[in-house]
Regions:
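Register position in tetratricopeptide repeats
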Residues: 62, 101, 135-136, 162, ...
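Structural marker of alpha-solenoid helical repeat scaffolds
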Residues: 45, 79-83, 118, 152
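Canonical tetratricopeptide repeat
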Residues: 55, 87-90, 94, 128, ...
């Protein structure tokens, strides 16, 4: 219980760190170091703790360390219970973002497809896949995702903006 609480507190600290009310830079360094120590302790005690891997991957992503973020999200996905479809879809989304940042668009697309197989109406996955398909020049496929998103939410600004991008290129 104590370790879960420490991990939860680490997550709260990370959220505070990344918020617009962030501390001064030197205090941020100490906060990140403390948070990473908590994650390391958690993983030393439970090397298959997928939630801690996920949280630390988010922290590394926030710091711009894509190599470590990718390693941790790979472990999170490896250990995630397959029955936790919503959370597993979120893990695939994070890995897609990491891969996209690394310039691995096709691998990112594979992960977005995996997230949508788990949760077919996942709005963020549809938006992200539409955006990625636009970047890859696959405008017809992107249009399908944006229209799907628009059917789910008739006021979706992401869908409208995506469709406008598609129209500008076709």
């Amino acid at each position: 219980m104590v370790s879960r609480l420490r991990c939860f507190i680490g997550g709260i600290l990370f959220c505070f760190f990344t918020s617009s009310f962030a501390l001064h830079a030197t205090e941020n360094d100490d906060l990140v170091k403390a948070m990473m120590e908590v994650y390391a302790e958690e993983l030393a005690a439970n090397p298959q703790d997928y939630r801690t891997y996920y949280s630390r991957a988010m922290a590394y992503f926030g710091q711009g360390d894509m190599k470590k973020a990718l390693s941790d999200i790979n472990n999170a996905i490896k250990y995630f219970p397959r029955k936790e479809k919503d959370d597993l879809a979120q893990a695939y989304l994070l890995r897609a973002k990491i891969l996209s940042e690394r310039g691995e668009a096709k691998s990112a697309l594979t992960d977005l497809n995996s997230a949508l197989r788990l949760v077919p109406n996942h709005r963020l996955a549809l938006k992200d896949r539409g955006d990625l398909l636009c970047r890859l020049g696959q405008y017809d496929m992107a249009k399908i995702d944006y229209n799907h998103l628009l059917r789910m939410d008739t006021r979706s600004q992401s869908a409208f903006m995506g469709l406008a991008r598609v129209e500008a290129h076709t």
